[in-house]
């Protein structure tokens, strides 16, 4: 990998990228409120579950969309996007995916200035596609020539950091703890990438009942710091 590709991955994979990720907790807010997550060990387990689920659902969507971009199959990009959106059973998950996806597309047309990204944002605004974050991420990075496995790694990192950053504001956990969790979970990244690179939207699965239960709890929560 050359330095130019690496720095683009770092830029667009940055946890402070202005796409609104800081407003979402990826379910950990309700998990902490209900006591499912209450210490470092349970937080690590929650992140691990989220990464496994992301690999078998959104990650496959990333790969399918990336392959469609490379093949210049714009209908394939849209199919992958709807596949990701339709597998998000709760409204808050769909809101997170589509809001961040649109923000990423809006930002990217000013940064990358690629016709495919302009077309993608137009499809989102016209309602022709949902504009989920995983697929938008694949479109933006594939347009820059970044490989599919690298984009899956970016997506996995984003899932983990969204949860860990939220946990820092919700429970008694230190920066050292969250960085150690992230480092340990990175050992499984190859396995998660292998799952995602199946890339078949017909095999995508979002079956994690606890996530949907926690989402339902979050909707009716009296105090909420995050949007999901």
Curated annotation (Swiss-Prot):
Taxonomic superkingdom: Bacteria
InterPro entries: UreF, UreF_sf
UniProt keyword annotations, A-Z: Chaperone, Cytoplasm, Nickel insertion
Keyword Cytoplasm applies: yes
Molecular function, one GO term: nickel cation binding
GO cellular component: cytoplasm
Gene3D superfamilies from the UniProt entry: Urease accessory protein UreF
Xref: PANTHER family: UREASE ACCESSORY PROTEIN F
Family as reported in the entry's similarity comment: Belongs to the UreF family.
Subunit composition and interactions: UreD, UreF and UreG form a complex that acts as a GTP-hydrolysis-dependent molecular chaperone, activating the urease apoprotein by helping to assemble the nickel containing metallocenter of UreC. The UreE protein probably delivers the nickel.
HAMAP family associated with the record: UreF
Protein name per UniProt: Urease accessory protein UreF
Source organism: Yersinia pseudotuberculosis serotype O:1b (strain IP 31758)
């Amino acid at each position: 990998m050359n330095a130019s590709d690496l720095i683009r991955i770092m830029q667009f994979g940055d946890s402070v990228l202005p796409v609104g990720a800081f407003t979402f907790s990826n379910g950990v807010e309700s998990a902490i409120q209900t006591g499912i997550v209450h210490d470092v060990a349970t937080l690590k387990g929650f992140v691990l579950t989220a990464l496994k689920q992301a690999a078998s659902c959104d990650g496959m969507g990333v790969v399918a969309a990336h392959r469609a971009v490379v093949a210049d199959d714009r209908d394939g990009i849209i199919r992958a996007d709807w596949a990701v959106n339709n597998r998000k059973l709760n409204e808050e998950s769909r809101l997170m995916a589509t809001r961040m996806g649109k923000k990423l597309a809006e930002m990217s047309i000013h940064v990358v200035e690629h016709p495919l990204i302009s077309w993608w944002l137009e499809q989102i605004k016209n309602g022709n596609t949902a504009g989920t974050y995983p697929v938008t991420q694949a479109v933006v990075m594939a347009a820059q020539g970044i490989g599919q496995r690298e984009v899956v790694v970016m997506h996995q990192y984003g899932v983990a950091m969204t949860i860990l950053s939220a946990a820092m504001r919700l429970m008694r956990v230190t920066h050292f703890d969250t960085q150690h969790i992230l480092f340990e979970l990175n050992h499984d990244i190859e396995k998660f990438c292998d799952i995602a690179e199946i890339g078949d939207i017909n095999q995508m699965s979002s079956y994690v009942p606890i996530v949907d239960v926690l989402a339902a709890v979050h909707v009716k929560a009296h105090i909420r710091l995050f949007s999901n």
